[in-house]
């Protein structure tokens, strides 16, 4: 009987570790300047925001972490507010982890908040809206050359 209990416990531990049971889900609110990244999503042989965040979380939490983003951005695109989620097998001190992540991450990525959510919550599928801002200017401006697009022809806003 003891042998069967040990086998049952080992099987339970194996299943829960492989299939994500017994984990807690957390949303991360972050912002980033995308100039140095190939975008949000992981790409082989390129530096992505997702990969950078995965590495930082995995090192600090001492477990491989894969974040799931609410959306994707392209190469060089910035995000003022982005959400992602990850699963972890223990309770997290959110304020402490935010502080550690911001000390560890490069200066162009900032974690604003970490929030415990229900296990069913999904950053991508539960997002209610997405807002995109496009910045253009119609004259050369040395202060706006990095975060906007220069368009020197007259704009046709009715088109």
Where are these regions (language model features)?
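Compositionally biased, low-complexity intrinsically disordered regions
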Residues: 1-4, 10
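Intrinsic disorder
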Residues: 3, 14-17
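A general, composition-driven signal for non-globular sequence regions
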Residues: 12-15, 66
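Structured-RNA-binding interfaces characteristic of tRNA pseudouridine synthases
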Residues: 19-159
């Amino acid at each position: 009987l003891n042998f069967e209990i040990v086998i049952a416990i080992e099987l339970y531990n194996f299943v829960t570790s492989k299939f994500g049971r017994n984990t807690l889900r957390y949303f991360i609110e972050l912002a980033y300047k995308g100039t140095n990244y190939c975008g949000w999503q992981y790409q082989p042989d390129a530096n992505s925001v997702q990969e950078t965040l995965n590495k930082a979380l995995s090192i600090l939490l001492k477990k491989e972490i894969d974040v799931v983003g609410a959306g994707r951005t392209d190469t060089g695109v910035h995000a003022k507010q982005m959400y992602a989620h990850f699963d972890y097998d223990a309770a997290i001190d959110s304020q402490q982890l935010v502080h550690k992540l911001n000390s560890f991450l490069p200066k162009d990525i900032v974690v604003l908040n970490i929030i415990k959510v229900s296990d069913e919550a999904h950053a991508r599928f539960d997002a209610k809206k997405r807002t995109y801002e496009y910045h253009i200017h119609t004259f050369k401006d040395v202060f706006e050359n990095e975060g906007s697009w220069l368009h020197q022809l007259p704009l046709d806003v009715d088109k």
